[in-house]
């Protein structure tokens, strides 16, 4: 079956070689006569998968030994609660508000009893079209929470501020797509369904000294319990971890995160350059803050936007509709998205624009 160009913001496109390997191994993994989905999580076969996945992500992100790597469940949304529960410890928590997901993290932290949330910077005044300057964080704060890529609004934070307190980062939509120095962070978390693998897995990278600060937490929500049990306090998402391991292998073959970032910059530059020179399409994001992985764009008409999404869908360009909260279009160019798809999209955009410059709307 012919593949389409899938611009979904998540779950998102996976590398074809990974999907092909999953297909080959689906009925019998490693000659076992069992699918990965059927393996006991306590078996040697799965333990090897888990160990390999951790080893690979440590290599790809250059994770120091004094950080734990956890393969959890509940999505990044559960980390909105786990982070303040485990790290706040009666102190103030500083947050930067750069978009919809940051707002949700802030909202959830405020629900945790005993946690005082301070929003120290925000770009909401201009519809989250830029990354705000982050002031010095008080040393009596428990942590500083940032969102490195704002999936809905299409902005990214590439320069992480130096901070006297641990920096916590939601990297869900640009982990492994840009190089970050893990040592600058106290904790990194990311839902898997954009650059890592299938939905259902959450990656957490946490510095050891931040674990076990709060006693009496529910076991499933306690980083200490999860770390002491090597991500297997309960049955982990075994199939998602297996696919993640294959994706990590694929990234390594592409030249690691640095190689992936170079390709991502080429893909994003192609699309942004076309949008910027177009007199039909435009970007709502300030150039200095533009994401490499999520590219929103609009026409000057909601009717044209609707027509574009419908015709794009009919021509094999799937999931280009912008998030319901912002409208317009959004092209998500995650690691596995091919540069040929960007080139094909640009050609389609040019054709669409030329046909509409006289004011015609075709649906």
Curated annotation (Swiss-Prot):
Question: Principal localization?
Answer: cytoplasm
**EC number in record:** 2.6.1.52
Please give the organism. Answer: Listeria monocytogenes serotype 4b (strain F2365)
Q: Self-association or partners: how does it assemble?
A: Homodimer.
The cross-references to Pfam families, in alphabetical order and at most eight, read: Aminotran_5
Against InterPro entries, the record matches this protein to: Aminotrans_V_dom (IPR000192), Aminotrans_V_PyrdxlP_BS (IPR020578), Pser_aminoTfrase (IPR022278), PyrdxlP-dep_Trfase (IPR015424), PyrdxlP-dep_Trfase_major (IPR015421), PyrdxlP-dep_Trfase_small (IPR015422)
The entry's function note states:
Catalyzes the reversible conversion of 3-phosphohydroxypyruvate to phosphoserine and of 3-hydroxy-2-oxo-4-phosphonooxybutanoate to phosphohydroxythreonine.
* GO BP terms in the entry: L-serine biosynthetic process; pyridoxine biosynthetic process
Q: Enzyme class, one word?
A: transferase
Cofactor(s) recorded in Swiss-Prot or TrEMBL: pyridoxal 5'-phosphate
Q: What is this protein called?
A: Phosphoserine aminotransferase
Arranged from A to Z, the UniProt key words for this protein are: Amino-acid biosynthesis, Aminotransferase, Cytoplasm, Pyridoxal phosphate, Pyridoxine biosynthesis, Serine biosynthesis, Transferase
The UniProt similarity line reads: Belongs to the class-V pyridoxal-phosphate-dependent aminotransferase family. SerC subfamily.
Q: Per UniProt, what is the name of the gene that codes for the protein in this document?
A: serC
């Amino acid at each position: 079956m012919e593949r389409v160009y899938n611009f979904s913001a998540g779950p998102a496109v996976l590398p074809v070689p990974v999907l092909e390997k999953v297909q080959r191994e689906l009925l019998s993994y490693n000659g076992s006569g069992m699918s990965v989905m059927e393996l006991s999580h306590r078996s040697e076969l799965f333990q090897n998968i888990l160990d390999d996945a951790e080893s690979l992500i440590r290599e790809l992100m250059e994770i120091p030994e004094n950080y734990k790597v956890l393969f959890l469940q509940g999505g990044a949304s559960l980390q909105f609660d786990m982070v303040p529960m485990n790290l706040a410890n009666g102190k103030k928590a500083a947050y930067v508000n750069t978009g919809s997901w940051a707002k949700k993290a802030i909202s959830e932290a405020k629900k945790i009893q005993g946690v005082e949330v301070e929003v120290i910077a925000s770009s909401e005044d201009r519809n989250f079209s830029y990354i705000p300057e982050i002031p010095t964080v008080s040393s009596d704060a428990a942590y500083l929470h940032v969102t490195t890529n704002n999936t809905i609004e299409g902005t990214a934070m590439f320069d992480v501020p130096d901070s006297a307190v641990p920096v916590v980062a939601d990297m869900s939509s640009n982990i492994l797509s840009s190089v970050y120095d893990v040592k600058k962070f106290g904790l990194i978390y990311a839902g898997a369904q954009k650059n890592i693998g299938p939905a259902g897995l959450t990656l957490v990278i946490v510095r050891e000294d931040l674990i076990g600060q709060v006693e009496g937490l529910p076991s499933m929500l306690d980083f200490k319990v999860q770390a002491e049990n090597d991500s297997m306090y309960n049955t982990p998402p075994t199939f998602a971890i297996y696919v993640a391991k294959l994706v990590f292998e694929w990234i390594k073959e592409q030249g690691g995160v640095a190689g992936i970032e170079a390709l991502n910059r080429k893909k994003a530059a192609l699309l942004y350059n076309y949008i910027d020179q177009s007199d039909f399409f435009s970007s709502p994001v300030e150039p200095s803050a533009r994401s490499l992985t999520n590219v929103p764009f609009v026409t000057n008409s909601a009717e044209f936007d609707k027509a574009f999404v419908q015709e794009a869908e009919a021509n094999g360009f799937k999931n280009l509709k912008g998030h319901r909260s912002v409208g317009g279009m959004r092209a998500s160019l995650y690691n596995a998205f091919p540069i040929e798809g960007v080139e094909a999209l640009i050609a389609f955009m040019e054709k669409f624009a030329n046909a509409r410059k006289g004011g015609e709307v075709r649906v």
